[in-house]
């Protein structure tokens, strides 16, 4: 399924039905009193979180959505039926903004959560409502209230506990495949990952956490280079970031310089994102070159108080200590301390 995380839509609530002008016309009562019914209320526009959805794809092809209008009132004091509400299902993590001002109108994260964003117009009152002692045969009724309408921008920010960051081809997709049931495309060329992937990582004592793998970030991403910058929003809700490094390219590529470059891109995108706790992961420990190069970079990270976890996504070496560290970051303790 195509991953769509931004759409612009126009929504409109229902118009209220008009009140009715009507009089009793019965045998032997040629000039009966007013009996016009009220118009029905217009339908509301409601956004509801559906945990079965993971993309805004459906809304991309339905940019104009409208609730049902209320029916007009009728004679014999019959009220018009209310218009059908427009219920728009969205995935967890959807942010709804005013398309013109950028104002955040709702941030929907919990399954079943809903918000009435536009109210339908009230139905007009029929002439039976206006009968008085001085005007027993009112020949007027209220029109229904008009609908509300608005252009909206919907943005999806995936809900994950852990964000997976790194330059292209450092083995992020291999890692998420190793620790979860997610199966992203894996190949030996840059930008194999073209969309965010979520994986549920089973931990101990029946606990688990969600990890998000986004396309690789490259230097200059904040100016539009590469693919990853537009997906950085999907790790904004995370608690901890895993920064994956590949030492197999040394000395042609400097992993410390790449680490600093990626963090500059984070800061340009969001200072809050750059301040999140990071765990440094050195992947591909199954390669002799990585084992040889590791001692050259460890002191730099340790001097800065950064935890470094060498591992191999290919063989599983070093995975368990990393998962324990993630557990401490998320819950304050690992399995041994429960």
UniProtKB/Swiss-Prot annotation:
Main location: cytoplasm
Pfam families xrefs: GTP1_OBG, MMR_HSR1
Cellular component GO terms held in the UniProt record: cytoplasm
Gene: obg
Organism: Geobacter sulfurreducens (strain ATCC 51573 / DSM 12127 / PCA)
Residue ranges occupied by any OBG-type G domain in the UniProt entry: 160-331
InterPro entries attached to this UniProt entry: G_OBG, GTP-bd, GTP-bd_Obg/CgtA, GTP1-OBG_CS, GTP1_OBG_dom, GTP1_OBG_dom_sf, OBG_GTPase, P-loop_NTPase
Protein name stated in the entry: GTPase Obg
Protein family membership: Belongs to the TRAFAC class OBG-HflX-like GTPase superfamily. OBG GTPase family.
Coiled-coil residue spans: none
Record note on quaternary structure: Monomer.
Taxonomic path: Bacteria, Pseudomonadati, Thermodesulfobacteriota, Desulfuromonadia, Geobacterales
Statement: the UniProt record of this protein carries the keyword GTP-binding: yes
SUPFAM superfamilies assigned: Obg GTP-binding protein N-terminal domain (SSF82051), P-loop containing nucleoside triphosphate hydrolases (SSF52540)
Amino-acid positions noted as binding GTP in the UniProt annotation, renumbered to this chain: 166-173, 191-195, 213-216, 283-286, 312-314
Cellular localization per UniProt: Cytoplasm
Annotated binding of Mg(2+), by residue: 173, 193
Function noted in UniProt: An essential GTPase which binds GTP, GDP and possibly (p)ppGpp with moderate affinity, with high nucleotide exchange rates and a fairly low GTP hydrolysis rate. Plays a role in control of the cell cycle, stress response, ribosome biogenesis and in those bacteria that undergo differentiation, in morphogenesis control.
Gene Ontology terms: biological process: ribosome biogenesis
UniProt keyword annotations, A-Z: Cytoplasm, GTP-binding, Hydrolase, Magnesium, Metal-binding, Nucleotide-binding
GO molecular function: GTP binding; GTPase activity; magnesium ion binding
NCBIfam families: Obg_CgtA, PRK12296.1, PRK12297.1, PRK12299.1
Residue span(s) of domain Obg: 1-159
Essential cofactor(s): Mg(2+)
Family annotation (Gene3D superfamilies): GTP1/OBG domain, P-loop containing nucleotide triphosphate hydrolases
Assigned EC number: 3.6.5.-
